[in-house]
Amino acid sequence: MTLNKHKKYLIISPSWLGDLIMSQSLYKVLKQQDPDCTIDIYAPAYTMPILDRMPELSGKFINPFEHGTFNLKQRYAEGKKFRDNHYDSVFILPNSLKSAFVGFFAKIPDRRGFKGESRYILINNMRTNKQDFPLMVQRYVALAFDRNEVKTAKDLPKFAYPKLETRPLDKKRASELGLDFSKKNLILGCGANYGPSKLWPVEYFAEISMWWIKQGGRVIGIGSKKDIPTVAKIYENLSEDTKPFFTDIAGKTNLTEALDIVGSSTAAVCNDSGLMHTVAAADIPQVCIFGSTSTNYTPPLSDKAICVESDEPCHPCFKRTCKFKTYACLKKLTPQMVIEKLEQLLSL
């Protein structure tokens, strides 16, 4: 039995941008099951512009809690606010105990999620078999189905990948940022909030940039304010003759501007990051770098993505930093390997 008899759903969203984008596959499945259903979402404020590009969603409510904040009293007040919405089901996508309280206090009768931090009672429609759904997106999508019908990932029907709406960037804004879309633009997703073990060396990004520019293209270094030093170092490593064709917009765009810039570009090279999942959902060819992390858990959900992945004995460790302090998993993924994949993707 699927959820087609239900009409109103609430999503408790993941906090990480990449996880949030992957969760769109769940919303697409819910709309497939019942095109007339209403899907509301409770998510961090910074994600709201991206959520506006997901046509499956209706109401968007800000989750005010910072990462790691418990505050049971406020969670009770937040849940109580949702009672009058009379949701049929809530989907708790994060694994934390605290993320399950809002749906419980909202008195939503069907509360779905995986076990996570021993969330018995709070989640009354619980799956305990994460190991049977290796990919994070499979876990999200599985929640749309009855546990007795879809027991493992093999039972899942084929589902749609995330697809964010992209729009042409305003010409005035493009000019302010120094962008030129008349050329083939390569996006560099050189950041990753998780930590150094996801960061491909800046010297390697610089080599890729110089190669692309010598093919007649331009390169865009993009990211949040945290990525400003990284993009600046890439620029410093460029040869003088290629620097005029590199545009540094790190910290200068909001999420939707970044999405629209990606959507108007030719290709991308990204670390395993939220931007990687954004590029995938914008349906742009990309090469993805997996050092400490694994494509067996959170791969880019796109037929236009190719991954280069470490084969070090310690891979994947999923650690923020390298315990050996060598970062061999990243350093042994050479620029030439990435260039070959780009050529394969674009038939250069």
Spans of model-derived segments:
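Conserved nucleotide-sugar phosphate-binding/catalytic loop shared by glycosyltransferases and other
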Residues: 38-71, 130, 310, 314
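An amphipathic, basic-hydrophobic alpha-helix
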Residues: 67-87, 101, 105
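Active-site donor-nucleotide binding/catalytic segment of nucleotide-sugar enzymes
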Residues: 168-230, 292-295, 338
